[in-house]
């Protein structure tokens, strides 16, 4: 795919963007197969492909330049500020809104934060889009709350022009470092969450809750996990590192008992809301550490099936040992880091790998998602 940013050397994030998509996926699939060399896999399923452009639902923009001429984007390798409002990973409506937000910052007269001088107010603009509704969550990451009055002054005009913006907040990040967000979130709209819908499952996104950045591929990931889980007809499921509940809520129904564990409390609030909306009554979502949760559970109340979707660091030996001890009929492991996945698979004992499938969640990069089915021997 042609990208002017990449060709100019301004943004090199999509390091494989000049390769045809088919070749990108082929390289990733081969990398995955090579990692599993020497490990028995019953069935390799065909990779799930992504759209080439317009697939990304989240923009994280550094605010650069000056109050009279702000730039939303990044600093290129030469140290120059570059606007990324026309990045082709974003849908067209998102690109339009990003351009408007550059004007918004200018009209509000908010000085961009300078890390080198520890001066300024506006650090980042974070924009998230719901694919199902086209609505947006807009967050301003500020050094202090001093600029909020300026944002509120210009906000009515912005919301009139873009009624799709349903949630606006200011995140206060006072530390003089390039840290993405702080602890304090101030809502500037009545709405405090963004609704998404994948495969007719309502999912909610709060400012600090994690959500996949490629919703079309995420929908296929959840749907395929649902199909794999259905084969086992489980009565009781654990969904560890459950986030906003994407996997568990796709796999549960009114007859299945589901326990979802996630350390981020905002994500748990979203998962509970989704379960309520679906009418599920045998669901328990809790804001806990997944490893500590598993260690504290009784073997008399063990699940038939466990779903895990850990961060890049993986599960770790302690949690893998717990999974082996509970010995569910099956484990569905979704990973964004195949290297930590391989380490974890060495620690999980008593299982055979029956299915592996790659999902091109992050096109034009070296990264991908992989779904693995482990069945009890």
From Swiss-Prot:
Pfam families: tRNA_U5-meth_tr (PF05958). Keywords: 4Fe-4S, Iron, Iron-sulfur, Metal-binding, Methyltransferase, rRNA processing, S-adenosyl-L-methionine, Transferase. One of its GO terms (molecular function) is rRNA (uridine-C5-)-methyltransferase activity. Belongs to the class I-like SAM-binding methyltransferase superfamily. RNA M5U methyltransferase family. RlmC subfamily. Catalyzes the formation of 5-methyl-uridine at position 747 (m5U747) in 23S rRNA. Its EC number is 2.1.1.189. It catalyses: uridine(747) in 23S rRNA + S-adenosyl-L-methionine = 5-methyluridine(747) in 23S rRNA + S-adenosyl-L-homocysteine + H(+). The lineage of its organism: Bacteria, Pseudomonadati, Pseudomonadota, Gammaproteobacteria, Alteromonadales. Transmembrane segments: none annotated. This is 23S rRNA (uracil(747)-C(5))-methyltransferase RlmC. Gene3D superfamilies: 2.40.50.1070, Vaccinia Virus protein VP39. It comes from the Bacteria. The active site is at residue 336. SUPFAM superfamilies: S-adenosyl-L-methionine-dependent methyltransferases. It is an enzyme of class 2 (transferase). It comes from Shewanella frigidimarina (strain NCIMB 400).
């Amino acid at each position: 795919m042609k990208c002017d940013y990449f060709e100019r050397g301004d943004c090199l994030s999509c390091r494989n963007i000049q390769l045809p998509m088919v070749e990108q996926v082929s390289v990733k699939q081969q990398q995955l197969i090579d990692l599993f060399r020497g490990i028995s896999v019953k069935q390799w399923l065909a990779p799930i492909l992504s759209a080439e452009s317009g697939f990304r639902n989240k923009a994280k923009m550094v605010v650069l330049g000056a109050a009279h001429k702000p730039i939303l984007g990044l600093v290129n390798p030469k140290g120059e500020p570059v606007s990324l409002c026309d990045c082709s990973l974003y849908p067209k409506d998102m690109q339009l809104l990003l351009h408007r937000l550059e004007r918004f910052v200018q009209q509000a007269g908010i000085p961009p934060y300078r890390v080198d001088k520890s001066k300024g107010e506006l650090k980042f603009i974070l924009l998230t889009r719901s694919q199902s509704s086209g609505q947006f969550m807009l967050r301003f990451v500020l050094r202090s709350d001093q600029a909020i009055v300026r944002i509120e002054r210009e906000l009515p005009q912005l919301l009139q022009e873009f009624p799709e913006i349903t949630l606006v907040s200011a995140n206060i990040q006072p530390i003089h470092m390039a840290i993405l967000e702080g602890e304090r979130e101030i809502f500037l709209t009545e709405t405090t969450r963004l609704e998404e819908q994948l495969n007719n499952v309502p999912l909610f996104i709060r400012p600090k809750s994690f959500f996949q950045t490629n919703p079309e591929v995420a929908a296929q990931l959840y749907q395929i996990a649902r199909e794999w889980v259905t084969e086992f007809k489980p009565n009781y499921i654990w969904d560890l590192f459950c986030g906003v509940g994407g996997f568990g809520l796709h796999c549960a129904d009114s007859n299945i008992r589901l326990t979802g564990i996630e350390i981020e409390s905002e994500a748990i609030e979203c998962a509970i809301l989704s379960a309520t909306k679906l009418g599920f009554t045998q669901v328990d979502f809790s804001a806990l550490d997944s490893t500590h949760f598993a260690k504290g559970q009784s073997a008399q109340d063990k699940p038939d099936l466990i779903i895990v979707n850990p961060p890049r660091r993986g599960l770790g030996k302690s949690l893998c040992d717990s999974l082996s001890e509970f010995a569910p009929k099956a484990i569905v492991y979704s990973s964004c880091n195949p290297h930590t996945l391989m380490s974890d698979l060495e620690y999980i004992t008593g299982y055979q790998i029956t299915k592996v499938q790659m999902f091109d969640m992050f096109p034009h990069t070296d990264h991908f998602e992989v779904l693995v089915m482990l069945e009890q021997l």
